[in-house]
Design a protein with these regions (language model features):
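Bilobed periplasmic-binding protein-like "clamshell/Venus-flytrap" ligand-binding domains
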Residues: 1-16, 155-166, 238-246
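Extracytoplasmic/periplasmic solute-binding protein
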Residues: 1-47, 90
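Glycine-centered hinge/linker elements that transmit conformational signals in sensory
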Residues: 35, 42-75, 119
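Extracytoplasmic/periplasmic substrate-recognition and gating elements
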Residues: 59, 63-67, 99, 105-168, ...
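Short helix-initiation/N-cap motifs at beta->coil->alpha
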Residues: 72-87
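Paired acidic/hydrophobic, glycine-rich loop segments that form the ligand-binding mouth/hinge
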Residues: 91-96
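Long, aromatic- and glycine/proline-rich binding clefts that accommodate carbohydrate-like moieties
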Residues: 110, 114-117, 163-216, 241-246
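Short, well-structured alpha-helical segments that form the helix of a local strand-helix-strand
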Residues: 224-236
Length: 246
C-alpha cells in the first residue's frame, strides 16, 4: 500500500505519562555505559556525560532516528514497545525485563517470534538495572531492631517465599531462581552486565535537565554538542554551589 510500517528500532521519547527520567533509563544510560562513560566524575564534584565518550554515545543514538518509527517523539517508551515491536513492526525494542516475560509475552503477543539480549556491547556491556535500598536512619530509636528487620526481609527464607508469589530478582546467592526458563540468564549469566545509577549530589535536577536536553537532541531541536553543553553547565553550576556549602 506504499505505507512504511516496518522499522529497525521501536522507540518512544514522550515522557508525559511516566516522567522525564524514564527515557534515560530506557535508552540513554545503556549507550553511555557501553561507550565507557558515566554521569558524574569519580569525585562527584562535576559531571562527565559531556566528554568524548558521552558525545559519541548520544551521536550514535541520534543516528538511529532514521531507523525508528516516525512518531517516536509522541509515543512513550512502553507504547512504542507494545504498539510497534509487539505488533511485529520493528526488529528491535527496549522494555523492562521480568522473570515472567516468557509467559506474559506469549499471552500479550501470541504471534510474535522474539528473543532478547540483556545488553549490547561497545567498549563494555551496560544496561540499566533499577536498585532500591532499605536505609537505617540516624534518628531511628532502636537501630538493632531495625537492622534485624532489614536482614529478615532481605534474607533468603523470606524472599524465597515472597518471590514464589511475586517473581523478582533474587537478593542473595542462596535464594533460588523463580521464573520462566527463558529469562533465567538475566539473573545468572548476565548479572555483571547491569549497572546502577551513580548516587551523586543534586541528582534529580541534573538528570531531569539531561533528559530534557536529550529529548531536544533526538527531536532535532538542538545539536549533540549544544544539548550536552547546556546540561553540563547546568549540572556543574548546581554542584559548585552544593560543594561550596560543605
Amino acid at each position: 500500500d506504499g505505507k512504511v510500517d516496518q522499522y529497525g528500532f521501536a522507540c518512544g521519547m514522550n515522557t508525559s505519562d511516566i516522567g522525564a527520567m524514564q527515557i534515560l533509563n530506557a535508552y540513554y544510560y545503556s549507550a553511555l555505559w557501553q561507550n565507557g562513560g558515566q554521569v558524574y566524575n569519580d569525585d562527584l564534584k562535576s559531571v562527565s556525560f559531556a566528554d568524548e565518550a558521552g558525545k559519541e554515545a548520544v551521536t550514535w543514538l541520534k543516528g538511529l532516528t532514521s531507523y525508528m518509527n516516525e512518531d517516536f517523539m509522541s509515543l512513550s517508551w512502553s507504547d512504542a514497545f507494545s504498539n510497534v515491536f509487539g505488533a511485529g513492526k520493528a526488529a528491535f525494542g527496549i522494555t523492562r525485563s521480568s522473570q515472567t516475560d516468557g509467559t506474559t509475552f506469549a499471552e500479550t503477543y501470541p504471534d510474535l517470534n522474539w528473543n532478547f539480549v540483556t545488553s549490547l556491547k561497545n567498549k563494555d556491556f551496560g544496561t540499566f538495572g533499577a536498585t532500591d535500598c532499605l536505609t537505617l536512619m540516624s534518628a531511628c530509636e532502636d537501630k538493632d531492631l531495625a537492622m534485624d528487620f532489614i536482614k529478615y526481609v532481605t534474607g533468603s527464607e523470606f524472599m524465597t517465599a515472597y518471590h514464589a508469589k511475586c517473581p523478582g530478582a533474587a537478593l542473595t546467592e542462596s535464594e533460588p531462581y523463580v521464573g520462566d526458563e527463558k529469562m533465567e540468564k538475566i539473573y545468572t549469566e548476565d548479572k555483571d552486565k547491569w549497572h546502577g545509577i551513580q548516587v551523586g549530589p543534586c541528582g534529580t535536577q541534573i538528570l531531569n535537565q539531561l533528559a530534557a536536553d536529550f529529548q531536544g537532541i533526538m527531536s532535532g531541536e538542538t545539536s549533540v554538542d549544544k544539548g550536552l553543553k547546556e546540561a553540563e553547565d547546568y549540572a556543574n553550576g548546581l554542584l559548585d554551589e552544593y560543594w561550596a556549602n560543605k
